Amino acid sequence: MLGKVERSEMYILFAMTQVLLVDKISGITSHTAVAKIRHLTGVKKIGHCGTLDPAACGLLIMGCGTATRLIRYMSNLDKRYIATITLGTQTTTDDSEGEIIYSAPKPSLDKITLESIGRAAEKLSGTIKQIPSAYSAIKVSGNRAYNLARQGIIPKLNAREVRVHWKFLGDFENNQVHVQITCSSGTYVRALARDMGKFLGVGGHLSYLKRLSIGPFHLHEIYREINKKEATMSERTPSGNTQGLTDNMAISDNMAISESDKHDCTEPGINCTELGIKDTCTALREVHYTQGDTLSFTRLTALQALSRIYKPIEVSQKQADDLSCGRYISLGIDSNGPVCAVCKENLIAVIQPVSAGLWRPETVLSDNRKLNSNAAQDASGST
C-alpha cells in the first residue's frame, strides 16, 4: 500500500492546486460531492459550478480556497452531455426519479421513428425559449421551485432563452434515443426530454445524463491523467507492485491502483477513442463516501484553469502591485473583452478594458508576501 497522506499535507496540496475536475457519480448530490472533497482536503472553502442532479453523473468543477472566486467565470460556459431519452412515459420530475403521470398507448409509440425524432430535435435546436422543469432550483417568490412542487403547488416559471445543438448516437430502440447535447448555461436537459416527448405526442423523460465538458474543461482529462499515472507506476514497480512507494508519490498519486479499480467508461453509441478515453479506464479511488463508491478527480492550478478561458498576459511587478491594490494599469494590447493578467505566477487577475490602453482589475488572486519579496529583489538588483 502507499504511505498515508497526512491531512495537513493534503491541505497544502489542495490550497495550492485550487481547481478540481471531479467525476461525480449518480446517486449523490453535487453538495455531497463538495462535502466529501472538503472532508478529504481539510479545505473549508470549496464551491462548485454547474449543479448536477443526483441521478446525473459526469464533470463537476470545484474551486478550493481563493479559487472559489473563479467559479463565476466557469458557470456561464457552454456544456456538453450525453443523454438517454425514454419516450412513451412522462414523469413529475421529467426524469426517471419522478412518478409516472402519463403512459402512451403502444400504437402511438409504434409510429415513432428516428426521422420523426429528428424533426422534434430540429424544433428544439438553435436559440429557443425553454420553460424549466417544475422540480428545479429556480426561486419563485423566495421559494425553490422544487419545494413548491413537492407541496403540490405547480410553480409558474418563465421561459428562458437557451441555445441547443443535438447529435444522435445510434438508433431508436426500446423506446429510447441516445443523444449528445451541447447547450448554453441554464439549459435543463430534463426539459428537453419532456418537450421532445410532448412534440411527438407520447410523453418523454430523461433516463440517463452524463456531463462530458464545461467549456474547455473535459471529463476525459481525469482519466487521461490517471492512465498516465498508471503507466508510470507500472514502469516504477514490477508486476504492478506498489509496495515501498514514497509519501511523496502518495501525495501525487493519492492511492494505489489495482485491477479491481477499473472503471468502465463506455457509453451507448459513444466512440471513446474520439473522446480520448480508453474503453476501460482506471479510476483513482480517492474519496470513499459509501462502501465501494468513490469520486475520481484531477487537479489544475488557478492559472491553468483561468488561462483556458481568457488569454494570459504577462504584467510587470509594479503592475501586479497596482492590481493587487485595486488600481488601474495601462497595457498596450487590443482586446474588447477580459484577459488574464499574470505576474510570475504570484498574481493572477481577470482584468477588464476601461478605455484605450486602460484596464481595471475585476478579480485578483495574489500572494502579497511573494509580490513584495519579488519587488524588493527587483529593486536591489537595479541599484
From Swiss-Prot:
Pfam families, alphabetized: TruB_N
Reaction(s) the record says it catalyses: uridine(55) in tRNA = pseudouridine(55) in tRNA
Record InterPro entries: PsdUridine_synth_cat_dom_sf (IPR020103), PsdUridine_synth_N (IPR002501), tRNA_psdUridine_synth_TruB (IPR014780)
Enzyme Commission number(s): 5.4.99.25
GO molecular function: RNA binding; tRNA pseudouridine(55) synthase activity
Sorted UniProt keywords: Isomerase, tRNA processing
Membrane-crossing segments per the record: none
Record function comment: Responsible for synthesis of pseudouridine from uracil-55 in the psi GC loop of transfer RNAs.
Descriptive protein name: tRNA pseudouridine synthase B
Annotated source species: Tropheryma whipplei (strain TW08/27) (Whipple's bacillus)
